[in-house]
Design a protein with these regions (language model features):
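Catalytic core of non-heme Fe(II) oxygenases with the double-stranded beta-helix
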Residues: 90-199
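Non-heme Fe(II)/2-oxoglutarate
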Residues: 1-105
Length: 199
């Protein structure tokens, strides 16, 4: 695991973690993604909350759905939903993030998260938007060798290459998007991290 940071301002940064999952974990995730790609193509489950522009047009062109909805009350059946807990219980990562900025401690104190899978085929994209999250953690996977689909932060002129097993963590209020995929299938796993209070 290699952790680096890109400063967007004096107050916050983007964390980039390469080789986050082990070879074994990555294999388990890839196997499940191959099955879930069919679910995405059949649109059995779909993301009903993608970002829209002021005219109500979708900013997203890709197949996506919340994994939590597919495995409702059966999370133990999903390798992905179990393996991605690593984000919250990896002490080495926690130490490095908090050493950079105490604000990252929200990741480990938050009590609610959801996992969205985005399957980007050729010509798919996600125009710049903001998330209603405290933090968003994006992890990139490859179902087929892909080109394009880099993560962009247009207000800060930052572009991060989308590569297998790379995690990018950033505050949800930062404008971000995915460039068009020009070849293959690129998958992103978005973990939306928040606080939840029952009313």
């Amino acid at each position: 695991m290699i952790v680096s940071f890109i400063d967007l301002s004096n107050n916050f940064s983007v964390a980039v973690i390469d080789n986050f999952y082990s070879v074994f974990e990555l294999g388990e995730i890839q196997n499940e993604l191959k099955l879930l790609n069919v679910v995405a193509e059949l649109k059995i489950f779909v993301n009903t909350e993608p970002a829209k522009d002021e005219q109500g047009n979708l900013k997203q062109k890709s197949n996506s759905f919340f994994l939590d909805n597919l495995y409702t009350n059966k999370r133990n059946l999903s390798k992905i939903l179990n393996i991605n807990r690593k984000l919250f219980n990896n002490e080495e990562l926690r130490t490095k993030l908090i050493e950079k900025n105490l604000f990252y401690n929200h990741i480990f104190n938050a009590n609610f998260d959801k996992t969205l899978l985005n399957f980007y085929a050729k010509d798919d994209y996600y125009k710049p938007h903001k998330d209603a999250t405290c933090f968003t953690a994006l992890t990139f996977f490859s179902l087929e060798e892909f080109c394009g689909g880099n993560l962009i932060f247009p207000e800060h002129n930052v572009e991060i290459v989308a590569k297998e097993n790379r995690v990018v963590i950033f505050p949800g209020f930062v404008l971000h998007g995915s460039e068009e995929v020009t070849k293959g299938i690129r998958v992103s796993m978005a973990q939306f991290i928040n606080y939840y209070t029952e009313t």
